[in-house]
């Protein structure tokens, strides 16, 4: 009986030694902590890069709006519309909202063509983009690309809104619009976080850290000379 008990103890001793063995625990603990530390540090770096891109987008939009108010309108109608001939006003008479109702012309690009459209346009006003306007649109995109090289024409929208400024017979455009530049559908793609946390799936099976679509960035200024030549 004593021999059997001794044999049982002898058989369990390797298991007990294994459960009490502490060799290698430091390496395991280091590996676990290092992964979390690595994700934390590079997560901070990537979010810092995202905020830098966010601020760059805001600044680029403001720069583009500043350029747009000093350039030919993308919509050729602002150059051709006459407060005298089309609205029946006397030379020098202000073009108020009572004379010409508020309207907005929106210009965008599909990557090939620049198009402008609007609703409630006054009689005699054509929203279509002209040659000078297409140059302006391209220049606006180029201005944004100085800070954000990955931006394309499809990300940019230029709007012109009649807000009751201008006068008949004014040099340049009779109507002085509020010019708005919008930067849309700008995305920031995560790299490090996507690698380490990509196993966490969001709706549709996409990695939750894959990318973030930023909100639209908008900058508006009242039109100035609206003439690239400065005349």
Regions found by a protein language model. Name each.
Residues 1-23:
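N-terminal leader/signal peptides at the extreme start of proteins
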Residues 2-10, 62-231:
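Short, conserved structural patches
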């Amino acid at each position: 009986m004593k021999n059997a008990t001794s044999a049982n103890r002898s058989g369990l001793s390797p298991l007990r030694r294994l459960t009490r063995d502490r060799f290698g625990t430091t390496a395991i603990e280091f590996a676990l902590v290092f992964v979390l530390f690595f994700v934390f540090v590079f997560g901070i770096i990537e979010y810092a890069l995202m905020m830098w891109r966010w601020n760059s987008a805001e600044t680029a939009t403001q720069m583009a709006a500043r350029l747009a108010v000093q350039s030919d309108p993308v919509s050729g109608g602002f150059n051709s519309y006459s407060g005298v001939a089309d609205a029946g006003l006397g030379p020098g008479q202000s073009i108020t909202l009572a004379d010409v109702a508020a309207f907005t012309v929106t210009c965008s690009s599909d990557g090939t063509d620049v198009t402008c459209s609007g609703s409630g346009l006054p009689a005699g006003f054509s929203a279509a983009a002209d040659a000078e306007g297409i140059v302006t649109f391209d220049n606006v995109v180029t201005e944004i690309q100085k800070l954000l090289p990955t931006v394309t024409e499809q990300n940019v929208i230029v709007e012109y809104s009649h807000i009751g400024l201008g006068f008949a017979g004014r040099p340049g455009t009779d109507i002085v619009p509020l010019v708005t530049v919008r930067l849309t559908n700008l995305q920031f793609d995560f790299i490090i976080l996507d690698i380490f946390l990509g196993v966490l799936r969001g709706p549709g099976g996409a990695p939750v850290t894959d990318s973030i679509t930023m909100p639209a960035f908008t900058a508006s200024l009242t039109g100035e000379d609206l003439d690239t030549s400065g005349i």
